[in-house]
């Protein structure tokens, strides 16, 4: 079934997009980590925001390299990739990387919210004065969700492998006894790997909704803070572009970009779960898989554009790259 619908041009397109993602992911996240680490070594200190940014960039670097290694193992050692132990290990690695990528981005949004927003509420002031502890507590609480997620995925993964190995000719797509996400078939090994993450989608998406909800609440409360601040400025007859308003606006722009990318990512996951006919199309399958990497890579470049230090470092690097490119052209010609 899979081999009849698969077009090699789709696989070629996927390969091109995949390698572009790998290169841009390494460059973007590597740049964030390098700039912050060099600044840390130079100043002998690092801010909480830069700590979160650096950890986020390193996590996404690990994610990109793990995806690259898994794909290389698939093509170079397919017999090794088909082992249940390797199948489980790949799933756990992707879940852990995705978990920390999303939760660290959520922590960054909560940090900006507590630092920039202004309320007279006693609970808010208590959290604002202890923002570092709040971020640390969020990370620790997220570890509980991670353990639950891995445990749940372990049960699903073990079940799917047992079914696949126990009845090699059985097509789970046509079965009403199993969830529609089990799309394993014996027609192609590539199809097995391409659909392996869909075993995890229903449970994993539920855990992904938790940080999304936290980020959404922080975004709307920050927007409420900006609205109250704007009304206060109108009463005091001050200009609309004061420092607090600009800080609110920049944080809201970054938060909105994150939520938009996050919502698109979740939309593709939910679409993959609910639409069986859609999932039979290899183009949608491949696009669904690369959407996760696109989300993290796009958000990394949003962070670069939204951070003054990273943006300034980018502007200082670009002239050097142009000069090096001109030198290479001179050598060639």
UniProtKB/Swiss-Prot annotation:
The leader peptide range reads none
Q: In which tissues is it expressed?
A: Expressed in subsets of taste receptor cells of the tongue and palate epithelium and exclusively in gustducin-positive cells. Expressed in the antrum and fundus (part of the stomach), duodenum and in gastric endocrine cells.
UniProt keyword annotations, A-Z: G-protein coupled receptor, Glycoprotein, Membrane, Receptor, Sensory transduction, Taste, Transducer, Transmembrane, Transmembrane helix
Q: Which residues lie on this side of the membrane: Cytoplasmic?
A: 38-57, 115-133, 228-250, 306-333
- Places the protein is found: Membrane
**Which residues does the annotation flag as glycosylated?**
167, 186, 195
Task: State the membrane topology.
Answer: Multi-pass membrane protein
**Regions that span the bilayer:** 15-37, 58-77, 92-114, 134-156, 205-227, 251-273, 283-305
Instruction: For this entry, list what GO says about its biological process.
Output: detection of chemical stimulus involved in sensory perception of bitter taste
One GO cellular component term: membrane
Q: Which InterPro entries match?
A: TAS2R
Q: Which residues lie on this side of the membrane: Extracellular?
A: 1-14, 78-91, 157-204, 274-282
| Highest taxon of source | Eukaryota
GO molecular function annotations of the record: bitter taste receptor activity; G protein-coupled receptor activity; taste receptor activity
Q: Does the keyword Membrane apply?
A: yes
What is the stated purpose of this protein? Gustducin-coupled receptor implicated in the perception of bitter compounds in the oral cavity and the gastrointestinal tract. Signals through PLCB2 and the calcium-regulated cation channel TRPM5.
Note, other = Several bitter taste receptors are expressed in a single taste receptor cell.
The family this protein is said to belong to: Belongs to the G-protein coupled receptor T2R family.
Please give the name of this protein.
Taste receptor type 2 member 123
Q: What species is this protein from?
A: Rattus norvegicus (Rat)
The lineage is: Eukaryota, Metazoa, Chordata, Craniata, Vertebrata
Q: Which gene encodes it?
A: Tas2r123
């Amino acid at each position: 079934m899979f081999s009849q619908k698969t077009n090699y041009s789709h696989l070629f397109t996927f390969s091109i997009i995949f390698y572009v993602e790998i290169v841009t992911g390494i460059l973007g996240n590597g740049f964030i980590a390098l700039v912050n680490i060099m600044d840390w070594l130079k100043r002998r200190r690092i801010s909480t925001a830069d700590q979160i940014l650096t950890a986020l960039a390193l996590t996404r670097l690990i994610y990109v390299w793990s995806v690259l290694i898994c794909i290389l193992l698939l093509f170079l050692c397919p017999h090794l990739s088909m082992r249940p132990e390797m199948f489980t290990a790949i799933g756990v690695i992707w879940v852990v990387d995705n978990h920390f990528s999303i939760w660290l981005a959520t922590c960054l949004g909560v940090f900006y919210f507590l630092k920039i927003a202004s309320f007279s509420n006693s609970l808010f002031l208590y959290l604002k004065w202890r923002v570092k502890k709040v971020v640390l507590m969020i990370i620790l609480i997220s570890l509980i969700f991670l353990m639950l997620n891995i445990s749940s995925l372990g049960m699903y993964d073990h079940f799917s492998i047992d079914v696949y190995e126990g009845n090699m000719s059985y097509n789970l797509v046509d079965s009403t006894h199993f969830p529609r996400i089990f799309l394993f078939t014996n027609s192609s090994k590539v199809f097995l790997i391409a659909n392996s993450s869909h075993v995890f989608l229903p449970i994993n998406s539920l855990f992904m909704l938790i940080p999304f909800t936290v980020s959404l609440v922080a975004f709307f409360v920050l927007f409420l803070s900006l609205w109250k601040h704007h009304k206060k400025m109108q009463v005091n007859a001050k200009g609309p572009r004061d420092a607090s308003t600009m800080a609110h606006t920049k944080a809201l722009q970054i938060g909105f970009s994150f939520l938009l990318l996050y919502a698109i990512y979740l939309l593709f996951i939910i679409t993959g779960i609910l639409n069986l006919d859609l999932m039979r199309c290899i183009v949608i399958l491949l696009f669904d898989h690369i959407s996760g990497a696109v989300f993290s890579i796009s958000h990394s470049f949003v962070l670069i554009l939204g951070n003054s230090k990273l943006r300034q470092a980018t502007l200082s690097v670009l002239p050097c790259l142009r000069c090096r490119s001109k030198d290479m052209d001179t050598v060639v010609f």
